[in-house]
Amino acid sequence: MKQFKRFAWLFLLLIPLLIVAGCGKSSSSDKTVKIGIMGSDEKIWKPIKKKLAKQGINLKLVTFTDYNQPNAALTNHEIDLNAFQHTYFMNTWNKAHKTNIVSIGKTVRAPLRLYSKKVKSVADIKKGDQITIPNDSTNEGRALHLLQSAGLIKVNNKVKLPTPKNITQNKLNLKITAVDAAQTPRSLSDATAAIVNNEFAAEAKLPNKECIYKEKLNKASIPYINVIATNKADKNNKTYKKIVKAYQSEATKKLIKKYYHGLSVPAW
């Protein structure tokens, strides 16, 4: 009886140690990965987060409100991945900030669109009207090329990323104003038209009927395919590759179609 009691006490003393050991094993097997996204993309990523949890990957969604934050956070290792930018934006950022951010997987193609609450077609735009465009260098240049494609202006085609200073013809004397990309939907209350990136258009719930012109999906738009990005040192990370694979699924294609109604289309 005494021997049984001795073993019983020993077992009770070991229980806390066994619990701690068990918890340690569980936490080490779960991999936590932080990915930076724009707020409008949460509804796409939440089902992917659930799917990855079954594989032992804890995907944390970190939302941002403008284009300057996600790459800075990635470089500073505040997040591990981001999924908000196209290749051209990423390359321009790397050059300007001397960083080594690389793509590890394609997400969507998102044609840039010209919206208006005041006119129903490009032909209705009048002399002296105001048009707002994103002010980051990549999307500003892209927006000016879109206005040229719409027949509203001409730019110096020798310049890859034109600014308003590179406009060579503006017959309607349009007032082209560059604002923060996140503010372009709001500018529609004052401006005749605005070029709005798809995530901000989705967030503002801009109806398709207010789109009066959009970018063509062709070879010229390939650099504008959106990607999942990470720091170059982590490009071969196996867990990150599993996240890309989880995103690039038929289920995600259906979600993109459901929530974006053609604003974005799968690019893989």
Predicted region positions:
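A conserved helix-loop-strand patch within extracytoplasmic ligand-binding domains
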Residues: 104-152, 253
